[in-house]
């Protein structure tokens, strides 16, 4: 039996045939609708399956990529080698006291809505963030003055070798769009958010206002990765790009949004090469005009 088939059969034995795909085009699994093929895409249904896949990866010395819901990532056209794991089945959300516990694959927007239903305040800022809970922890996601760091109590993670452990807010070293696990690549399994009782009407009004701001300013009618660049100290990335005259410009099917210059949209079947070339054009032009280096907020993965 060839090695790839052997690995496939082992993955099927762990996760079930319906949860293992071979040579899967990743453009179907990223919000920007871009990306080459993954050798193996797996969707574990339990923490035990996550650990078993990690141990298999170790045994066969396979490359490994954990993907959230594909919101903040560009996968190159050559795709991803080895195993790609998504935790979309691990999506439970529940309440214990004033804490909300969410599994890594849950949508952070769904957790924000659940908090509203439970009359708990603290997660309003997340009502429009397009991402999984695990991804939100890794990036210390934030919007409109709030961030994960403000409400996170602790997380359960699996290390890349399959060891389970708990990390507190302090141990996670949460900073602006970064965390300890963005460097260690530990896999978030479960998250505890510490919230406060609040007034349903006030919580809903704040979420409605943030949703309106987002929908009126962001180009949600086209696929994109969301905000491409981090906020440079003392500036706004979108304003620098706008003042550089780059809106409506790009390569191939990728284009700097005319609605919000901080977004690059997939306007017409863009490839990853189109998208990355557009990013580099923006960075180069802003550096030349304003002397400001734009840092990426998105992750670029895979082979060219």
UniProtKB/Swiss-Prot annotation:
- Tell me the active site: 177, 227, 297
Show the SUPFAM superfamilies listed in the entry.
FAD-binding/transporter-associated domain-like, Uridine diphospho-N-Acetylenolpyruvylglucosamine reductase, MurB, C-terminal domain
Family annotation (InterPro entries): FAD-bd_PCMH, FAD-bd_PCMH-like_sf, FAD-bd_PCMH_sub1, FAD-bd_PCMH_sub2, MurB, MurB_C, MurB_C_sf, Oxid_FAD_bind_N
Quote the pathway field. Cell wall biogenesis; peptidoglycan biosynthesis
Under Enzyme Commission nomenclature, its number is: 1.3.1.98
Its recorded reaction(s) are: UDP-N-acetyl-alpha-D-muramate + NADP(+) = UDP-N-acetyl-3-O-(1-carboxyvinyl)-alpha-D-glucosamine + NADPH + H(+)
The main enzyme category here is: oxidoreductase
Pfam families attached here? FAD_binding_4 (PF01565), MurB_C (PF02873)
Q: Name one GO molecular function term.
A: UDP-N-acetylmuramate dehydrogenase activity
Q: Quick one: a GO biological-process term for this protein? A: cell wall organization
Kindly give the PROSITE patterns that the UniProt entry links to this protein.
Answer: FAD_PCMH
Q: Where is the FAD-binding PCMH-type domain?
A: 34-198
Which cofactors does this protein require? FAD
**Which keywords describe this protein according to UniProt?**
Cell cycle, Cell division, Cell shape, Cell wall biogenesis/degradation, Cytoplasm, FAD, Flavoprotein, NADP, Oxidoreductase, Peptidoglycan synthesis
Main localization of the protein described in the UniProt heading: cytoplasm
Q: Where's it found, cell-wise?
A: Cytoplasm
Q: Which GO terms describe its cellular component?
A: cytosol
Q: Which family does it belong to?
A: Belongs to the MurB family.
Q: What does this protein do?
A: Cell wall formation.
This protein is called: UDP-N-acetylenolpyruvoylglucosamine reductase
């Amino acid at each position: 039996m060839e090695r790839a088939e052997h690995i496939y059969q082992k993955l099927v034995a762990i996760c079930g045939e319906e949860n293992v795909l071979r040579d899967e085009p990743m453009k179907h699994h990223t919000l920007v609708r871009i990306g080459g093929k993954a050798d193996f895409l797996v969707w574990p249904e339990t923490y035990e399956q996550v650990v078993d896949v990690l141990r298999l990866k170790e045994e066969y010395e396979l490359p490994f990529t954990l993907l959230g819901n594909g919101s903040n990532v560009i996968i190159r056209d050559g795709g991803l080698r080895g195993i790609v794991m998504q935790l979309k089945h691990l999506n439970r959300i529940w309440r214990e006291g004033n804490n909300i516990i969410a599994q890594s694959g849950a949508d952070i927007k769904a957790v924000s809505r659940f908090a509203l239903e439970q009359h708990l305040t603290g997660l309003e800022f997340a009502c429009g963030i397009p991402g999984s809970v695990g991804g939100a922890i890794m990036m210390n996601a934030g919007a409109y003055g709030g961030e994960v760091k403000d409400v996170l109590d602790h997380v359960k993670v699996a290390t890349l070798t399959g060891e389970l452990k708990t990390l507190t807010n302090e141990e996670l070293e949460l900073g602006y769009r970064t965390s300890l696990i963005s460097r260690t690549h530990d896999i978030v399994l479960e998250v505890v958010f510490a919230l406060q009782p609040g007034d349903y009407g006030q919580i809903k009004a704040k979420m409605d206002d943030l949703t309106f701001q987002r929908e009126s300013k962001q180009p949600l009618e086209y696929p994109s990765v969301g905000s491409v660049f981090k906020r440079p100290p003392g500036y706004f990335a979108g304003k620098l790009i706008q003042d550089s005259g780059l809106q409506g410009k790009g390569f191939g099917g990728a284009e700097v949004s005319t609605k919000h210059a901080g977004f690059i949209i997939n306007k017409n079947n863009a490839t990853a090469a189109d998208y990355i070339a557009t990013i580099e054009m923006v960075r180069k032009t802003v550096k030349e005009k304003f002397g400001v280096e734009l840092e990426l907020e998105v992750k670029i993965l895979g082979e060219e």
